[in-house]
């Protein structure tokens, strides 16, 4: 035997508890098996064991967790899967599975499909808070989409009438459970959206039920109908679960049809009190406005314009006449100035024309002089120009040779000549 100090039972139990509580593998786990030793205490806690072919584990389903369970009743021999954490019961020295959620086998696959649909619709913005429509404070007509025979319709009508007897109620009956339920719910919502009915708010839902009973309100068509409704929708499905997609798509959701009616319909006495307060505020505002206008009228009545209106009008008329005379005089001065400028421009034009005429005569005279001095004019008077065969102008006989062929340029043309003699 070793010399180490022996541990007490409590110490060993505490070590085991710490090991269990510190293990991530034993927290938030799913366990499947068959129910045995099922019992429910007066406190509401449920105790049972889960077993398979080789082992058994004790489970505790506390009241605060099992009150949200809406599935079929639990009983011995039923196959389920549970979600929870392993804990150690120190007094008994036994470990236990503290259950927070129970699902029937096969339900987990459905939940996975619902979660995928939820993510898909969330990406599309179906659940966006900014798209939620405001629930009217004082609806005149309430539309109800639910089963015409269930307790939900009775609760909604009873509460609505008790709160506001004058409320108009329009019922669009529909199937709320089974394969035909989704299409029936969609048709009811679309009918209540028809403009002829003038519905202000819709309550859509049903009383409580099992997980399978509520599946219609997780259907994609129903969720889209909620989101696409022109009229605000309050979701009212009893025993609300955390996977009911229609609740997320609705403009507001409540845990029961009764709560939906209480939220949608104001109490008549509250409405009357509001109207009374509103009437008081309107009267107070009118009194203040009238008093303010009376003071303003009194102030204006003391002004000159209201005391001697004709005198003020005569002054304004005289002022207009003075302005008219000034305008007429200014216009006359403008016209005279323009007339003087026009005459000045006309005289200037005449002077320019005379100058141009004299300039033209001088130009013609000098042109004639220049033409008289040109070679062509000189040759017309009998002169000629003599060139050698290279085109050089001959100015004296010494510049030519005997028998040299020369060109004579006359006024009428040219001719060839030959020099004779020395």
Curated annotation (Swiss-Prot):
Report the superkingdom from the record. Answer: Bacteria
Localization annotation: Cytoplasm
Look up the record and give one Gene Ontology term from the biological process aspect: DNA catabolic process
Q: Which GO terms describe its molecular function?
A: exodeoxyribonuclease VII activity; nucleic acid binding
Mention any Pfam family matching this sequence: Exonuc_VII_L
The UniProt entry, under Gene3D superfamilies, shows:
2.40.50.1010
* Catalysed transformations (reactions): Exonucleolytic cleavage in either 5'- to 3'- or 3'- to 5'-direction to yield nucleoside 5'-phosphates
Query: Is Cytoplasm among the key words of this record?
Result: yes
* E.C. number(s) listed in UniProt: 3.1.11.6
For this record, an example GO cellular component is: cytoplasm
Keyword field: Cytoplasm, Exonuclease, Hydrolase, Nuclease
Relate the assembly described in the record. Answer: Heterooligomer composed of large and small subunits.
Q: Which family does it belong to?
A: Belongs to the XseA family.
Described by its record, this protein's role is as follows: Bidirectionally degrades single-stranded DNA into large acid-insoluble oligonucleotides, which are then degraded further into small acid-soluble oligonucleotides.
This protein is called Exodeoxyribonuclease 7 large subunit
What are the leading ranks of the lineage? Bacteria, Pseudomonadati, Spirochaetota, Spirochaetia, Leptospirales
